[in-house]
Amino acid sequence: MKTLIDMHTHTGFSPDGEGTVEQSLAKAKELGLAAFAITDHCDCNFRYKADHYGDPEALKDGMMYGSGEYAPASIVAQYEAAQHLEGLNFLCGIELGQPLQDIEFAEEIASDKRLDFIIGSHHQNKGKDDFYWIEYKNMDLSQTYALLEDYFKEMLEMCKWGKLDVLGHLTYPLRYIQGDCGIQIDLAPYDEIIREIFCTLIQKGKGIEINVSGLRQKYGKPLPDLGFVKLYKALGGEILTIGSDAHC
C-alpha cells in the first residue's frame, strides 16, 4: 500500500501561487494524502515593500516584496482552517527563505507557535538575484561555479542557525542552470561543504526535503537527486520529507 504525503505546497498567499487554503486542503483530502503541509513563501530579505529598499529595480524578483504581510496572513489562514478540519493530517507551515538576510524577521516567524513545520530554503545569495532570474548563458562558467560556492556557504550558515525542520531543495540552482539553460554542472567541488551541511542538520536533529518539482520540469530529477539522499542517510540522517512544490 502506497503512502502519499506532500510537505511543500503554496497557495495564493505566496506571490507566485494560486488558490486558497481551503481549496488546497480539500484537494489533499480528495487525494487521500497521509500528511499535508502548506508552506507559503516567507523570503526574509523581502520583508517590506519595494520602496523600503531604495531601488525597487535592484532585484528582478519584485513580486516577492512584502513578505512581512503575506507570510503572517498565510499562517493565520492556515491556523484558522485547521481548527475545524477533519480527516486530514495537516501541518501549518512556512517556507522560510534567506532567513539570515533579515535575522530579526526570521526569528519572529520561526517562533510563531502556530507553525508545525518550517522549510529552510535558500533561493538567492545576498545581494544577488534569485537563481531563477540569472542569465547563466551570458556568464563565464567560472562565475556560475563561484555563485554556487557562495550558495552552499550561505546555506551552511542557515543550517547552523537551525530554526527549521527540513532543508528545502538542496540543489535548487540546478533547476535553472542545467534544466533551463542546459549547462552541465559538476558538484564534486562542493562535496565537502555539502557533507558539512548534512552533518550540521543531523547533529541538530533536522531533515532534508526531496523536492520532486524537478521531475515535471526540464531538469528531470528531484532536488536533490538520489545520490545526495543516500549520502545524507550514510552520514546518519533519518528525516526525509517529500514535497511537490505545487503553486496552485
List each language-model region with its residue ranges.
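Positions that flank functional sites
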Residues: 43-44, 174, 215-216, 247-248
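Short, conserved acidic/polar surface loops in the N-terminal third of protein domains
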Residues: 48-49, 101-105, 129-132
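A short acidic, amphipathic alpha-helical/loop segment
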Residues: 105-106, 231
